[in-house]
Amino acid sequence: NTYLGFQSSIYVNSTWYNQTCNQSHYVHRLHRDYDDFKFLGITIYWNDVKEQNAPLGFVKKSHTNPNIVEPVSILTGSAGTVLITDTFALHKGYPALKERYTSSIRFGKLFNAATVINGFLKS
């Protein structure tokens, strides 16, 4: 927990299947995730992810410097690739021209904007 600076918990644990959308014009805009003031994500690619498999686009070092907005690095990898990310950094998704299987785990405070509604944990 050195990066986060506090004792963290897993607050998201999910598996994703992105099926083919055949819309090459579909791209998410660059954005930041605002789950909490500090959090860390791990993504595992379960199949080879190339530019056609909805890779993650990421602007390196933009989590600590808000003036950095480019270039966007496309994070491809072979099956078993593990990405460790701080998605407060600018990032975006690309279209799934071929299917993609991933798992996502997020570490942070258990009680944060992604897990709490009106003071109660989301179920």
What spans do the regions from the language model cover?
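Signature of the catalytic double-stranded beta-helix
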Residues: 1-15, 30-31
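Phosphate/oxyanion-binding loops and surfaces in catalytic or ligand/nucleic-acid-binding neighborhoods
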Residues: 2, 6, 49, 110
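A short, structural micro-pattern
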Residues: 9-10, 36-38, 97-99
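A structural signal for short, well-ordered beta-strand segments
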Residues: 13-15, 42-44, 103-107
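Short, well-ordered beta-to-alpha junction loops that form the rim of enzyme active sites
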Residues: 13-15, 61, 87-89
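Catalytic core of non-heme Fe(II) oxygenases with the double-stranded beta-helix
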Residues: 21-76, 82, 112-121
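Short beta-turn/strand-loop junction motif enriched in small, turn-promoting residues
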Residues: 45-47, 88-91
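Non-heme Fe(II)/2-oxoglutarate
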Residues: 82, 89-123
